[in-house]
A protein has these predicted regions:
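Short, flexible helix-loop junctions that flank or precede catalytic/ligand sites
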Residues: 1-254
């Protein structure tokens, strides 16, 4: 039992990751239901029964949840959570021997937790139920055919915490691209992830600590920040510093 939170800004592959996480659960041995907005495009997951609400028919997300609970599901999932009342009821279900998986728009794993606290989830309840908060971003990969080597300037080395001897060259996008990447200088995308979980984090969630303290607690539990994961891809030539700056200046959705 417990609560799993998935988050990202818009257009960061969140729907795909949500499907993967839910599909990885042992749904053949458990009954899962999803709470879905009837106005949204259907996106069904095998062996997960959708229960839909429709504001045009005066049914609310909580109405759909109550209907779903009549089936005594072991798991409940919902995407792009925005309804405060539904959020509270879902966390209560996570506290009552059910696995709850939700997704919402947030810039990182800690912001997702603070958003739940901010909409009125009792801190001790959230701390008791939180299994983990997983955040992701999608970054474009440099085209392997036309990417260029360059000597990073001192300010970039300082940002990467490297010396010139440790990092004599980096990769960047080719100026004109090539036929392989259709002139874009990038080819394909990859995801970077950040997982906030652990006893230290839950201890400070219960205290409703500020985001900086929560991030420090999560780091002690082993969380590697998204930016750190992104810089790892810069160092190994998978992507460029310019791409990381583009990704991390994008605003999170609300």
């Amino acid at each position: 039992k417990g609560l799993i939170v998935l988050s990202s800004p818009g257009a960061s592959g969140l729907s795909t990751s949500f499907d993967v996480v839910v599909s990885s659960a042992d749904r053949l041995l458990r009954d899962f239901v999803s709470i879905e907005d009837a106005a949204a495009p259907p996106r069904e997951i095998q062996n997960v029964k959708p229960v839909r609400y429709d504001a045009r028919a005066n049914t609310s997300p909580v109405d759909a949840l109550r209907e779903a609970l009549r089936e005594y599901p072991a798991g409940i999932v919902t995407r792009d959570l925005r309804d405060k009342e539904l959020a509270l009821e879902l966390v209560k279900q996570a506290d009552e021997n059910k696995l709850v998986v939700i997704s919402l728009r947030a810039g990182d794993a800690i912001e997702a937790v603070t958003r739940l606290l901010g909409i009125g989830i009792p801190p001790e309840l959230l701390a008791r139920t939180l299994l983990g908060s997983l955040s992701q971003r999608l970054v474009r990969k440099l085209c392997p055919k036309c990417r260029e080597e360059f000597e990073p300037p001192p300010e970039m080395l300082q940002r990467l915490k490297k010396t010139k001897e440790e990092l004599p060259t980096l990769k960047r996008a080719g100026e004109t691209g090539c036929r392989v990447c259709a002139g874009t200088a990038y080819f394909g995308r990859t995801a970077i992830f950040e997982l906030a979980s652990g006893e230290m984090l839950r201890r400070y969630v219960a205290k409703k600590a500020d985001p900086k303290v929560l991030a420090q607690a999560a780091a002690k539990d082993g969380m590697r920040p998204l930016r750190e994961e992104g810089m790892r891809l810069v160092l190994d030539g998978t992507t460029a510093m310019d791409e990381m700056q583009r990704v991390f200046t994008a605003k999170s959705g609300g």
